[in-house]
Amino acid sequence: MEQEQDTPWTQLTEHINIQKKGNGQQTQRLGRPNLTQLMDHYLRIMSQADMHKQTVSWKQWLSLKNPTQGFLKTRALKRWKSFNKQGWTD
């Protein structure tokens, strides 16, 4: 049977289980989360990151995709003015 090697990942994910003996003293036992717990944790973190990314993208999309002609006209004029101020820099 293979013995688990200490890697930065397993060292970081070690957690301490504290158990009380009959005489009231506490003992510490180092334990590692099993693979299922690690995968659950990883999937939870990645899901949260993905939700945040989707929310940011959706907000950006909403800010850019305003269908009114007035908005598009104003935006085009701003870009044109900005372009004229910069001139040909190539």
Curated annotation (Swiss-Prot):
Belongs to the influenza viruses PB1-F2 family. Transmembrane segments: none annotated. This is Protein PB1-F2. It comes from Influenza A virus (strain A/Beijing/39/1975 H3N2). Residues 1-31 are annotated as: Disordered. Oligomer. Interacts with human SLC25A6/ANT3 and VDAC1. Interacts with host MAVS. Plays an important role in promoting lung pathology in both primary viral infection and secondary bacterial infection. Promotes alteration of mitochondrial morphology, dissipation of mitochondrial membrane potential, and cell death. Alternatively, inhibits the production of interferon in the infected cell at the level of host mitochondrial antiviral signaling MAVS. Its level of expression differs greatly depending on which cell type is infected, in a manner that is independent of the levels of expression of other viral proteins. Monocytic cells are more affected than epithelial cells. It holds the Pfam family PB1-F2. Is not encoded in all strains, and seems to be dispensable for replication.
